[in-house]
C-alpha cells in the first residue's frame, strides 16, 4: 500500500507542475493596465482606475500606459493603421487596411505613444490573415490577424487586450478609442505623432441601422452627442475598448475601427467591426497557424480560477482514492 501511494505521489507531482505552469503562464492578465499610483511614480499621466486622463478628432493626447495594447502598423516605414495586441504573437486589425498589400514590408511599433521616438521598437510581421468573407465594398467582416515573426516581450507598456463573446452592448461601459489618425479634418494628410484617445458611447444597432443603411449585424456603432469627437482616417484597425459594468479593472476590445460617414459629424456615429462575432474565428485561425489564442467565453469564472479549480479537484480526487 505504501509503495502504491508513493507511486501515486510520483505521478501527481509532474501533473501538478504542468497545471501550475499553465496557470502561471496566465499571470500576465489581459486588459489590466498599470495602476494609477505606479503610473504617477513613473512620471506618466495619472489616471483614475477605469478613467483615462486623456479625453483622433476631438480627442486628447494619451499615454501608452493607459492603452498598452495599442500598436501602430507600418508599411515601408509609414504609419498605415492601428492594431491591438492579443498576445505575444498576434495583433488584431481591420482587413480594409491591407487591400492589395502583402506582409513583406509590414511591421508594428509598440510600447510608445510617440511615433517620433528615437530608437523606436519595430516588430516584423510574418503572416497576414484577412477574413475569408471580407467584403471590400460593404466592409463586412472587416477583421484581420497579423502573426509576428518573433514574440513580443510583454511588459507594462505592452499588454494584451481581452476579448469576449458577449454581444450585448448593455454589458459595457466607459468606452474609448485610440489612434494616430488625423485630428483635424481640414488638414487632410496631417497625422499626429502622439497617440490620441477619445471617449465614446455605444449605440443601439437598430438606431444606427436607421441612420446608416449599409450597417450589417457584424458591425456596431459608437460616438458622442457632441460633434467633433470620433475616430478618423488613420485610426482604422485600432481598438474600441470598454469595461464590463461589473468589472472596471479589466479592459475588453469590443470593436475595431472600420468606417464612417465623415469624422465627428453630428448624429453620424463611427462604425466598428463587432469583435464578439469573431472570437471563435480568431481562435480557430490562430490554432491553425500553430500559435493558439484563447478568448474569454461567456462564463462567470475567470480562466485563472479554472486552473486553480482543476488543481483543487485533482487533490480532492487524490485524497479520496
Curated annotation (Swiss-Prot):
Put simply, this protein is called Serine protease 52
The cross-references to Pfam families, in alphabetical order and at most eight, read:
Trypsin (PF00089)
Residues passing through the membrane, by range: 300-320
* Statement: the UniProt record of this protein carries the keyword Ribonucleoprotein: no
As for subcellular location, the record says: Membrane
Which EC numbers does the record give?
A: 3.4.21.-
Entry annotated with the keyword Phosphoprotein = no
Task: Name the catalytic site residues.
Answer: 96, 142, 236
Which residues get glycosylated?
Answer: 153
Q: What is the lineage of its organism?
A: Eukaryota, Metazoa, Chordata, Craniata, Vertebrata
Membrane association type: Single-pass type I membrane protein
GO biological process assignments: proteolysis
SS bond partners = 81-97, 175-242, 208-221, 232-263
The protein's superkingdom reads Eukaryota
Matching Gene3D superfamilies? Trypsin-like serine proteases (2.40.10.10)
Amino acid at each position: 500500500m505504501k509503495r502504491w501511494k508513493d507511486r501515486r505521489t510520483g505521478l501527481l507531482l509532474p501533473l501538478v507542475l504542468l497545471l501550475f505552469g499553465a496557470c502561471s503562464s496566465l499571470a500576465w492578465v489581459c486588459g489590466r493596465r498599470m495602476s494609477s499610483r505606479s503610473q504617477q511614480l513613473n512620471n506618466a499621466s495619472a489616471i483614475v482606475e477605469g478613467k483615462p486622463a486623456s479625453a483622433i478628432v476631438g480627442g486628447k493626447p494619451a499615454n501608452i500606459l493607459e492603452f498598452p495594447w495599442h500598436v501602430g502598423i507600418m508599411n515601408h516605414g509609414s504609419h498605415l493603421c492601428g492594431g491591438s495586441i492579443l498576445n505575444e504573437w498576434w495583433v488584431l486589425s481591420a482587413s480594409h487596411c491591407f487591400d492589395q498589400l502583402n506582409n513583406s514590408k509590414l511591421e508594428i511599433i509598440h510600447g510608445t505613444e510617440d511615433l517620433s521616438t528615437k530608437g523606436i521598437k519595430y516588430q516584423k510581421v510574418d503572416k497576414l490573415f484577412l477574413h475569408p468573407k471580407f467584403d471590400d465594398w460593404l466592409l463586412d467582416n472587416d477583421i484581420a490577424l497579423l502573426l509576428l515573426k518573433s514574440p513580443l516581450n510583454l511588459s507594462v507598456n505592452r499588454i494584451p487586450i481581452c476579448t469576449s463573446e458577449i454581444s450585448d452592448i448593455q454589458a459595457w461601459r466607459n468606452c474609448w478609442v485610440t489612434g494616430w489618425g488625423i485630428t483635424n479634418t481640414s488638414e487632410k494628410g496631417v497625422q499626429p505623432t502622439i497617440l490620441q484617445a477619445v471617449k465614446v458611447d455605444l449605440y443601439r444597432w437598430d438606431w444606427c441601422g436607421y441612420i446608416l443603411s449599409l450597417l450589417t449585424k457584424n458591425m456596431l456603432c459608437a460616438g458622442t452627442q457632441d460633434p467633433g469627437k470620433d475616430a478618423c482616417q488613420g485610426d482604422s484597425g485600432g481598438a474600441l475598448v470598454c469595461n464590463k459594468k461589473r468589472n472596471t479593472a479589466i479592459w475588453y476590445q469590443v470593436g475595431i475601427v472600420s468606417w464612417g460617414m465623415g469624422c465627428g459629424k453630428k448624429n453620424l456615429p463611427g462604425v466598428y467591426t463587432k469583435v464578439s462575432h469573431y472570437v471563435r474565428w480568431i481562435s480557430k485561425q490562430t490554432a491553425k497557424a500553430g500559435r493558439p489564442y484563447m478568448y474569454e467565453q461567456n462564463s462567470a469564472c475567470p480562466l485563472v480560477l479554472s486552473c486553480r479549480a482543476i488543481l483543487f479537484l485533482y487533490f480532492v480526487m487524490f485524497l479520496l482514492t
